């Protein structure tokens, strides 16, 4: 990652403005029960996309979690970077706390399952699970932070993080429409090819932009 540089205010405000506009669209065209569309917006009526907390709870928790994450610089990638390179444990302790909280919550609600079998919305092909996460991890390392950190920085006005966050939205839409997304029924039709291509692209970007010490 290159050093941060000052840019125009409009550049930094672009992603927060887009996020506010999307929120306003939701308020103007709220989801109609059991209907896949409300005005120009489309909603999931089944599957994981349809499972979410009530709007007020989601917004309130997002506000609280966002404050803590921004102030603590929470980042899963940064946690391991600081631990291995600088022996700095501040971010890693935050990651460990999140893992412990998720573990306890799942144990109390009966959602704790070990292994690949029986996991919600996931297939059991170990190799492509592993390669998919290697590709994702490499992309996050090149970007300088995990997806959550990118969202937090985008909200702070980091235009690079804003582009990354928009890329995640566009990428998710393309994956589901082009047959590369996987599910509990198995690997997507073109999931393997997309994983290999994505990994190759990340390697090329990394080597092309690498600098000698």
Indicate residue ranges for each PLM-predicted region.
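Membrane-interfacial helix-loop segments of redox and metal-homeostasis proteins
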Residues: 1-213
